[in-house]
């Protein structure tokens, strides 16, 4: 149910807030990939989690624009 709560929180946000969150998530993904390439990342599953969150944010943005 944790994911459903996250999606509901996303749906409650405005388009500007969603765009800010999307930019922040993409920056985090970039940093995680960089850490993974330099063997500094312990929790590699975080990359997958952030990628899915980016997709969730983009989906909510598309739903709001439709």
From Swiss-Prot:
PROSITE patterns: RIBOSOMAL_L29
HAMAP family for this protein: Ribosomal_uL29
Pfam hit, one: Ribosomal_L29
Family (UniProt): Belongs to the universal ribosomal protein uL29 family.
Keyword terms, alphabetized: Ribonucleoprotein, Ribosomal protein
Any one GO MF annotation of this record: structural constituent of ribosome
Protein name, UniProt field: Large ribosomal subunit protein uL29
Coiled-coil segments on the chain, per record: none
GO cellular component, one term: cytosolic large ribosomal subunit
GO biological process: translation
């Amino acid at each position: 149910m944790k994911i459903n709560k996250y999606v509901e929180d996303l749906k409650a946000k405005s388009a500007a807030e969603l765009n800010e969150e999307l930019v922040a998530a993409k920056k985090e993904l970039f940093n995680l990939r960089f850490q993974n390439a330099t063997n500094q990342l312990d929790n590699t599953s975080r990359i997958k989690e952030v990628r899915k969150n980016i997709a969730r944010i983009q989906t909510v943005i598309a739903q709001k624009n439709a």
